[in-house]
Amino acid sequence: MTRYFMKFTPLFAAEVQMMTPPRHQPRGSGRIRSSFRYSADDVRCKDCTRYDSGQPCHLNECVCLEERIEAGVVELNTLARECFGGRMFRPLQRRLRDELNRQPFRFFLGDAHRERWTHWKNRCYGMSGRNAAALFLLTADEELWQRVLWHFDSSGFDFSAIRLSGIHPELYSIYQAAKTISVGGDNIVIEDLAFSELVSDRAFRLILGALLLCRYGEVVLNLERKTEETT
C-alpha cells in the first residue's frame, strides 16, 4: 500500500506526482450500474414470503413494488384506480381513463419543477410522505412557490401565513389540493377532480401525481422512467 509522508502538507501534490508511474492512467470513478433487469417471472406474487392467496396485498403495502414496476407488471392505471378506491364515481372514472389514454403520463411539468421539488425535499430531511406530496404540488409553478417558500420546513407548511391574493384560479386549486393532502380537510374533494370547470387538465395531472406519490411513495416516479424507456 502506498504511503505518503507529505500528506496534509503543501508538498503533498508534488509527492503524489513523483510517486506516480510514467503514463499511468488513473482509474475512473462513478457508480457501477448493474445490467440485470427484473422480469415478470422474478416478481410473481405467489413467490413472495407474504403471499396469501385468500387476501392479496394492497399495492401500497407491497414490499416489491419498485421491482414490479421495473418488470412492467404494475401499470399506472392500476395504481390510480387503487389509489382512489371505491370513491371513483362515473364522471371521475371517465376523466381518469381519458387522461391516461391521451398521452404518456408525466409526473413533473418539466425540469424546473423536478429540480425545485428535489432540492427542497432533500433540504428538509425527514419530511413526511404527505408533506413531500404537498411539496410536489407547491413547487410545480414558480409563482406559487415564491408565495410558499418562506412558510415551510421539514415539519410542514404554515398555510395560515401564505397569501394568495391575485393568484391564477388554476394555481389556487393546486394549492388547495396540497393543503388537503398535507393537513386534511375538505378544501378540495375527490368529486371535484371529475370536472374540468373546477380542476384544469394540468392541475388534474399534478394532483393525480401527488396522490400517487402520497400513497405509494417515491417509487411511483419510476413509472415515468419506465414509460420513457418504452416510447
Pin down the residues of each PLM region.
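GHKL/Bergerat-fold ATPase module
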Residues: 182-186
